[in-house]
Amino acid sequence: MSNSIVIIGSGFAARQLVKNIRKQDASIPLTLIAADSMDEYNKPDLSHVISQGQRADDLTRQTAGEFAEQFNLRLFPHTWVTDIDAEAHVVKSQNNQWQYDKLVLATGASAFVPPVPGRELMLTLNSQQEYRACETQLRDARRVLIVGGGLIGIELAMDFCRAGKAVTLIDNAASILASLMLPEVSSRLQHRLTEMGVHLLLKSQLQGLEKTDSGILATLDRQRSIEVDAVIAATGLRPETALARRAGLTINRGVCVDSYLQTSNADIYALGDCAEINGQVLPFLQPIQLSAMVLAKNLLGNNTPLKLPAMLVKIKTPELPLHLAGETQRQDLRWQINTERQGMVARGVDDGDQLRAFVVSEDRMKEAFGLLKTLPM
């Protein structure tokens, strides 16, 4: 059995793993190393900080010191890991090194910033640290441009709009949430955003940003431009794989792991947003929780495979909340859409009339768990 576990990272995945390990073993040596402060906060809250008037420090739930004391840990905050010597089982920073028996990479994912001229003017909201760096600018901004119409983009667009700001959202696609669902399914939310006053620039492309005396000039395709006070990149996340790559691990979109969360090195595991589990990157809370439960067992000597059930994804748009599950992005499904004043139920079925995906909104969200049970594993 392992007698020394080192975890690189301090986010939701790392903390879930620590809690699950400590439920089973109170004394095994645990060391966490991370580049941030290691204070705990709820990352989904970042989608609502502006309308709720929260400062970055308001998000803190537990300090690093309290976490270390509660779970009997050695913590090394504000520490950049530079290398992993997989053969010697050593993790290195500029001024320190740690021996491990088992190593877990929980390095998360970073916000992708489109490579356009002036990209340094774009803000990202992927961590408490990032919000702390730009909270004054965002609070003071009257005009906000959000680049990207996916999950995070529409959540932020609604939140900034609810806070009374003039919001423009730009995306290359013809509809919002284009990578998740067809336009006929997302149209209810798209209409609500427009009703609220969000200016949607779909089938549009950001070409560059330039600082001006009165704000930021965003140049778009088709000889268009708009001036705003802040620009937020919400164009997706990229798993942090640089450290794993330097350690010689197999990398695809994320750090490749099998059903046991094991990488191509038998003593190194990966968990959370940085991990690609049997070809899938799953940056949502429920698969991370289930993965942490399984990995804790395996680090303590078990051999338990991860089995993920059909899972709900919740879109945090309070004016028109949505839950979805299954293969909503499949192009070959027939969608049966029932829309009422209280909400929508959209069912995606295959050629054999088997339910493969669904999207529910508002008061109809209470039907989600019944539908979830009918989805194939």
Swiss-Prot record:
Localization per Swiss-Prot or TrEMBL: Cytoplasm
Any single GO CC term annotated in Swiss-Prot or TrEMBL for this entry: cytoplasm
EC class of the enzyme, as a word: oxidoreductase
Gene3D superfamilies for the chain: 3.30.390.120, FAD/NAD(P)-binding domain (3.50.50.60)
Enzyme Commission number: 1.18.1.-
Pfam families cross-referenced by the UniProt entry: Pyr_redox_2, Rbx_binding
Pathway the protein takes part in: Nitrogen metabolism; nitric oxide reduction
Cofactor annotation: FAD
GO function terms (MF aspect): oxidoreductase activity, acting on iron-sulfur proteins as donors, NAD or NADP as acceptor
Catalysed transformations (reactions): 2 reduced [nitric oxide reductase rubredoxin domain] + NAD(+) + H(+) = 2 oxidized [nitric oxide reductase rubredoxin domain] + NADH
InterPro entries assigned: FAD-bd_OxRdtase, FAD/NAD-bd_sf, FAD/NAD-binding_dom, NO_rdtase_NorW, Rbx-bd
UniProt KW keywords: Cytoplasm, FAD, Flavoprotein, NAD, Oxidoreductase
This protein's record includes keyword NAD: yes
Keyword NAD in record: yes
Chain's role: One of at least two accessory proteins for anaerobic nitric oxide (NO) reductase. Reduces the rubredoxin moiety of NO reductase.
Family named by the database record: Belongs to the FAD-dependent oxidoreductase family.
Matches recorded under PANTHER family: NITRITE REDUCTASE [NAD(P)H] (PTHR43429:SF3), PYRIDINE NUCLEOTIDE-DISULFIDE OXIDOREDUCTASE DOMAIN-CONTAINING (PTHR43429)
Protein name: Nitric oxide reductase FlRd-NAD(+) reductase
Source organism of this protein record: Escherichia coli O7:K1 (strain IAI39 / ExPEC)
Gene it is expressed from: norW
